[in-house]
Design a protein with these regions (language model features):
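Membrane-targeting and insertion segments and their boundary/processing signals
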Residues: 35-43, 60-63, 67
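Short pre-active-site segment immediately N-terminal to the catalytic Zn-binding motif
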Residues: 46-65, 79-84
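Metalloprotease/metallohydrolase-associated module, dominated by Zn2+-dependent proteases
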Residues: 2-6, 10-42, 49, 79-169
Length: 169
């Protein structure tokens, strides 16, 4: 648990600790993955596992942890009979996240954007542009430029080496 708490914003550590002590689940911190921030799965032996990317952004880490804990709660209550990001998950996610939704834990603009996001949360926080931009302010500096900041006609490349040109809308 200490490893998990080391990634959490300090004002949220006690709440997270209490939540995790009441939750029979294994949590593993992984190196950064390109396709997801976290993952929940039921293992063959019947136990549950959450994997979370190690990230220097404590707010992204906390949001991802709460997102995956909502999957765990839904799996406990409904087994595998519901959609992964359906109404049951959205309700569970709101219930878990709301106690953390205050400016002592999430600074503005994250707090206000996250409150709006919770009205109808997406399967991934990366699908909410305003939330992505609010969280980005707490990521380490990057030499990468987001595509939306490029001018029409500019070239850009992906990590796999593929090169593209930004076109006009």
């Amino acid at each position: 648990m200490e490893q998990v708490l080391s990634f959490i914003p300090t004002p949220a550590k006690l709440q997270v600790e209490e939540l995790l002590e009441a939750t029979p689940i294994e949590i593993k911190i992984t190196p950064k993955r390109l396709t997801k921030h976290g993952d929940f799965r039921r293992q063959a032996n019947g136990t549950s596992l959450i994997t979370l990317n190690a990230t220097p952004n404590p707010y992204r880490f906390l949001i991802t942890l709460l997102h995956e804990l909502a999957h765990f709660k839904v799996s406990q209550q409904f087994s595998l009979r519901v959609k992964p990001h359906g109404a049951e998950w959205k309700t569970a996610y709101r219930k878990i996240l709301v106690p953390f939704l205050n400016p002592e834990i999430f600074p503005d603009p994250i707090c206000s954007v996250l409150a709006r996001h919770m009205k109808n949360p997406k399967a991934s926080t990366d699908r909410d542009f305003k939330l992505v931009m609010a969280l980005r302010k707490y990521d380490p500096p990057s030499l990468k430029t987001p595509v939306f900041e490029l001018e029409s006609g500019q070239y850009f490349s992906l990590d796999n080496g593929r090169v593209f040109t930004k076109l006009k809308k």
